[in-house]
Amino acid sequence: MSGIKQQNTQPAGMRTINTLYFYLTEGCNLACRHCWMGPRFETKDSRHATLPVELFETAIREAKPLGLSGVKLTGGEPLLHPHFKTLLEIVRREDLRLTVETNGLLCTPEISAEIAKCPNRSVSISLDGTDAATHDWIRGVPGSFDAARQAVRNLVATGTKPQIIFSLMRKNVDQVDDMVRMAEELGASSLKFNVVQPTARGEKLHEAQEALTIAHLIEVGRYVEQVLAPQAKVDIFFHHPHAFKNLKRIASGNGYGACGIFGILGVIASGHYALCGIGEQVPDLIFGAVGEANLEDVWRDNAILKALREGLPERLEGVCGLCLMKEQCLGACVAQNYYSKGTLWAPYWFCEQANNAGLFPASRLAK
């Protein structure tokens, strides 16, 4: 296919599609206990659906006139896609910003070198423990710890310093300090501590009481931001809602921007547009088939997208509706809120639990 060089021709007043999130595969080569997507386990003998290259190109072609400037390649596991290198070639050809989220098992020196050819790139690697016993237990496959560490080394060797993502739970919370040191030693650009979402497998993890309590999450978040981050040799981020973040760090813009929900759209492996990867779990949040539904029509006219643009943040309910940070936070994660409560305006579970426990910062609530 020839280069997709259309200029931004979106109608006046229509929001820009900044980034397409491509969920390239329905399968994954790990079986992570906390995954919010819940992809099917894939082996050499069991293959699952992947997004066709032609639909990848179609989505980009139709998004370019609407302002597209970047893509995120995620999954499932994006490196399982049989034509991953071809997808990278398309990204380079169209001069798009590239983000890749991977577990690292297939991030070989060759793949790392291909990623490095994309000039505007970022990569994140999941590492959920500082030892094989912890990481492999969480990820469900022996050897995944060593593979993930090697993936970081491969990327660094080819000029890409990845972000390491560490998902917090009872099994690994005592390794937070050691994880900072490991990230520094491996040459990562940053380390992000993720809160496990109660979606798909993550919901089961919460039900099994393997997730951290809200009080513990708040305590760890405060420790990471106030103690670890100032002295670390890599950038440190803790993924909690704006109401719990340090105002100085928010003002710095250093990784603490608002949710990009107004400028992103998902493309799932079945070849459908969706709010994001939540479309894999919630059919209500699928917006039409790529190549059949015109993207400009979807972006402009879809009832859910229109409701979000018109209703956020004013229609947020509960503690989120009262929060002084709602303009920045936008409900933290609308997809998670809809999954939990069946409404776009539901309060974010983290903030709701904190408020119910008397732990929500009073200074961040409207009087």
What residue spans do the PLM features occupy?
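Accessory C-terminal segments flanking Radical SAM cores
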Residues: 240-360
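Radical SAM enzyme [4Fe-4S]-AdoMet core and its adjacent flexible, acidic
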Residues: 94, 117, 126-128, 133-293
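Flexible loop residues that form catalytic
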Residues: 40, 76, 128, 196, ...
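Short beta->alpha junction loops/turns
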Residues: 25, 77, 104-105, 128, ...
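Residue-level signal for the nucleotide or nucleotide-sugar donor/cofactor binding architecture
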Residues: 51, 82, 143, 171-174, ...
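Short Fe-S-cluster ligation motifs
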Residues: 58-75, 308, 346-367
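Conserved alpha-helical substructure of the radical SAM core
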Residues: 2-122
